[in-house]
Amino acid sequence: MTIWDQPKENSLAALLHGMQIADGIEFDLRISSDGDFVVYHNELVPGEGDKSERSIERMSTSELRSLGIATFDELLSQRVLTDVWQAGGKTANIEFKVPHPAARIDDVDAHLSAMMGLLEESLVPFDLPARSALVYSFSPRIGSVAKSVGFEFPVTRLSPYLRPWGSYRIKRLVGTPGFVLSTVTGLIKEHREEGMPAVAMALQYLQGWERFAHPGTPMAISGGGLERLNRARAGM
């Protein structure tokens, strides 16, 4: 019996596998110092050097590729992925990652705008079916920037807000107040008022004891809680 060797997260192998066996994939995009998209989650590459030198946005595409980081162009060159994406029935959830402060990118709006322009340039030629790509970010500016530039793809904001730097635990510790003080109903209302077609939220809003940690009527992914959720999000 062959043992499946799980591919590395955000690798070409993982994304190609996911697009073939599932109804879609999720991946993270950052921009290199050369202005190219790279598929990478963390804000820094591993190492002991200065954080500014390890920030993805301050590294060249060739440097990042030498570390095994795939570019978005490499992903789009894979017909096994793009053919099924164009055929319909598959969705790609694309997260725009906000740079680490060490990258010294102060104008987040301009950075998001550049990412949107580059994504359109990359994907529009594929003439993807409607609702086959959703872009989201933890940045609270994602919606307003998308409107200001007339972005062609639907966007939504990830909740609760997590800052773009720090360890996994620190990020979640800082995000805890926002989680506790928000409600599923409130998030749905906010996203709807901003014209967002979907609500992207942490699973803890709907599952486990954490769903009782914030005010409002608890919702869930099954039973009566799911019925309440479906009523609240009708049309989204």
Where are these regions (language model features)?
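Phosphate-group recognition and catalysis centered on beta-loop-alpha active-site segments
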Residues: M1-M236
